[in-house]
Amino acid sequence: MSDDETLADVRIVLIGDEGCGKTSLVMSLLEDEWVDAVPRRLDRVLIPADVTPENVTTSIVDLSIKEEDENWIVSEIRQANVICVVYSVTDESTVDGIQTKWLPLIRQSFGEYHETPVILVGNKSDGTANNTDKILPIMEANTEVETCVECSARTMKNVSEIFYYAQKAVIYPTRPLYDADTKQLTDRARKALIRVFKICDRDNDGYLSDTELNDFQKLCFGIPLTSTALEDVKRAVSDGCPDGVANDSLMLAGFLYLHLLFIERGRHETTWAVLRKFGYETSLKLSEDYLYPRITIPVGCSTELSPEGVQFVSALFEKYDEDKDGCLSPSELQNLFSVCPVPVITKDNILALETNQRGWLTYNGYMAYWNMTTLINLTQTFEQLAYLGFPVGRSGPGRAGNTLDSIRVTRERKKDLENHGTDRKVFQCLVVGAKDAGKTVFMQSLAGRGMADVAQIGRRHSPFVINRVRVKEESKYLLLREVDVLSPQDALGSGETSADVVAFLYDISNPDSFAFCATVYQKYFYRTKTPCVMIATKVEREEVDQRWEVPPEEFCRQFELPKPIKFSTGNIGQSSSPIFEQLAMMAVYPHLRRVFYLNDSNLLSKITFGAAIVALAGFLVLKNL
């Protein structure tokens, strides 16, 4: 294929018996008149986009069986977007050749079940000859045949229409949308249009009201429908689909039927305009650019929901919280994410989030989910937001945008340290500890779950827990991430060592528990700028001496760490525990590490930032903010 041809949006290949007028058709198209002297075969022709009705660059290839070997012919056919099989209406043998030679050759090239459209072109129709009785059975028996056009290169009859239909067959193909055998929408098309309907059903009542229909019309086509046009649409649907209209609104069945009507009436471009507005490619899959927009995240930066992203996901919650109880029941949650290809929030990963006593996702837990995913798995956030309909309508007519507007890239941490402040909302805390140190109980407490809840959690559960905490009268998200290491010699990944704060948990009743924490700290976090704190668990039990060079308190003094914090029974299940507030404060203000060291951790956790702050710790914090 030539370099110029690789730029073509549509590649049309003409095949057919010798003498059918393939070359004459191309010459008549180029010259806009009949040409008496034509070559045996033309080289490839490239037609610029600005002279085509659909504004697409088009390549036309004139194949000659006699002049080329079969392998080359097959190779050329395989590169085609659409194939025109040319026959002569004055020669019935060329009609027979469609079934005996050309369609089999096309299937040999693409495989028995292919989706490359085929157009039958009956040339030399300037006389009285008519082959309709033979052509119609061919079209009915071969679903890849999109249409048949009779034309005349001599009189210019339908010459430009042939190539227009060929372009349309590629740009607005029928087969992905319509099953010619069942005369119904394909499963892929139904699934895509159901997603479109659910996104446009703003109030989630199962209907498209006149307002929602008009919003849909303006979004996809740039102009509103008149009241008369709206009534005509609903009347046409009611006539053919009794269940399509109710309460003077369009139901899902009616919406699907409306697009079936468009396709059956040859208005495929209408349905394709809708589908492409909502991100679909010809394969009826969402485009990669739509799902995964390119983004560069500098080292030291993180990603969070932007105000637009927060507004979008918050509105989704309101839309699908049908009983307005501030929670999403399993059915409401399933309904919200029904347009996504795979389950989003499962029984396992819901343990990372706040739920009510029935295990239903609260609004707080729902928003925490999006903040967690955006921080640790941005690709997943992009994908899910795209399926859910963000940012349809933001990028102009005929195209879906991308999800970049849904997120913001935070400032580099190094600059935050230099400026003694940050505008970040989400912070990650690494939770490190030996087996049975109480990590699961500690982490689940952030989600408000007590011992009885933890007892029901299986061994395989999410290594994350996230919730909102208050820091200096601001709402932040603290994401706890458990480090799954069996021994302190196990290596930590770069993602694990780049946390905002680290909590080392040790069991005061296990003499070997602290050694695990001390070893990991010295190996990975000593002399780094990451704030760290030791947390003593199971403090109601009898404390034993730890098998380490020095006791935990002395270890913290030597390494200028805050004194160990006690995680007691009273903290279990308390998402508002001062311990979580202190971890968040250390993450938000890492430049205050020495303040945390100089002062008692329990005192510091109780500090209230306001107009008047007492004690030395308050003075030091104010001085360094």
UniProtKB/Swiss-Prot annotation:
<dbReference type="GO" id="GO:0019725">
    <property type="term" value="P:cellular homeostasis"/>
</dbReference>
<dbReference type="GO" id="GO:0005741">
    <property type="term" value="C:mitochondrial outer membrane"/>
</dbReference>
<keyword id="KW-0472">Membrane</keyword>
<keyword id="KW-0378">Hydrolase</keyword>
<dbReference type="InterPro" id="IPR021181">
    <property type="entry name" value="Miro"/>
</dbReference>
<dbReference type="InterPro" id="IPR011992">
    <property type="entry name" value="EF-hand-dom_pair"/>
</dbReference>
<dbReference type="InterPro" id="IPR001806">
    <property type="entry name" value="Small_GTPase"/>
</dbReference>
<feature type="binding site">
    <location>
        <begin position="16"/>
        <end position="23"/>
    </location>
    <ligand>
        <name>GTP 1</name>
    </ligand>
</feature>
<keyword id="KW-0479">Metal-binding</keyword>
<dbReference type="Pfam" id="PF00071">
    <property type="entry name" value="Ras"/>
</dbReference>
<feature type="binding site">
    <location>
        <position position="201"/>
    </location>
    <ligand>
        <name>Ca(2+) 1</name>
    </ligand>
</feature>
<feature type="topological domain" description="Mitochondrial intermembrane">
    <location>
        <begin position="623"/>
        <end position="625"/>
    </location>
</feature>
<dbReference type="GO" id="GO:0007005">
    <property type="term" value="P:mitochondrion organization"/>
</dbReference>
<dbReference type="InterPro" id="IPR013567">
    <property type="entry name" value="EF_hand_assoc_2"/>
</dbReference>
<dbReference type="GO" id="GO:0005525">
    <property type="term" value="F:GTP binding"/>
</dbReference>
<protein>
    <recommendedName>
        <fullName>Mitochondrial Rho GTPase 1</fullName>
        <ecNumber>3.6.5.-</ecNumber>
    </recommendedName>
</protein>
<feature type="binding site">
    <location>
        <position position="203"/>
    </location>
    <ligand>
        <name>Ca(2+) 1</name>
    </ligand>
</feature>
<feature type="binding site">
    <location>
        <position position="323"/>
    </location>
    <ligand>
        <name>Ca(2+) 2</name>
    </ligand>
</feature>
<dbReference type="InterPro" id="IPR052266">
    <property type="entry name" value="Miro-EF-hand_domain"/>
</dbReference>
<dbReference type="InterPro" id="IPR002048">
    <property type="entry name" value="EF_hand_dom"/>
</dbReference>
<feature type="domain" description="Miro 1">
    <location>
        <begin position="3"/>
        <end position="170"/>
    </location>
</feature>
<feature type="binding site">
    <location>
        <begin position="123"/>
        <end position="126"/>
    </location>
    <ligand>
        <name>GTP 1</name>
    </ligand>
</feature>
<dbReference type="InterPro" id="IPR027417">
    <property type="entry name" value="P-loop_NTPase"/>
</dbReference>
<dbReference type="GO" id="GO:0047497">
    <property type="term" value="P:mitochondrion transport along microtubule"/>
</dbReference>
<feature type="binding site">
    <location>
        <begin position="433"/>
        <end position="440"/>
    </location>
    <ligand>
        <name>GTP 2</name>
    </ligand>
</feature>
<comment type="similarity">
    <text>Belongs to the mitochondrial Rho GTPase family.</text>
</comment>
<keyword id="KW-0342">GTP-binding</keyword>
<keyword id="KW-0677">Repeat</keyword>
<dbReference type="InterPro" id="IPR020860">
    <property type="entry name" value="MIRO_dom"/>
</dbReference>
<keyword id="KW-1133">Transmembrane helix</keyword>
<feature type="binding site">
    <location>
        <position position="327"/>
    </location>
    <ligand>
        <name>Ca(2+) 2</name>
    </ligand>
</feature>
<dbReference type="Pfam" id="PF08355">
    <property type="entry name" value="EF_assoc_1"/>
</dbReference>
<feature type="binding site">
    <location>
        <position position="325"/>
    </location>
    <ligand>
        <name>Ca(2+) 2</name>
    </ligand>
</feature>
<feature type="domain" description="EF-hand 1">
    <location>
        <begin position="188"/>
        <end position="223"/>
    </location>
</feature>
<keyword id="KW-0496">Mitochondrion</keyword>
<feature type="binding site">
    <location>
        <begin position="62"/>
        <end position="66"/>
    </location>
    <ligand>
        <name>GTP 1</name>
    </ligand>
</feature>
<dbReference type="Pfam" id="PF13202">
    <property type="entry name" value="EF-hand_5"/>
</dbReference>
<dbReference type="InterPro" id="IPR013566">
    <property type="entry name" value="EF_hand_assoc_1"/>
</dbReference>
<feature type="topological domain" description="Cytoplasmic">
    <location>
        <begin position="1"/>
        <end position="601"/>
    </location>
</feature>
<feature type="domain" description="Miro 2">
    <location>
        <begin position="420"/>
        <end position="625"/>
    </location>
</feature>
<feature type="binding site">
    <location>
        <position position="207"/>
    </location>
    <ligand>
        <name>Ca(2+) 1</name>
    </ligand>
</feature>
<keyword id="KW-1000">Mitochondrion outer membrane</keyword>
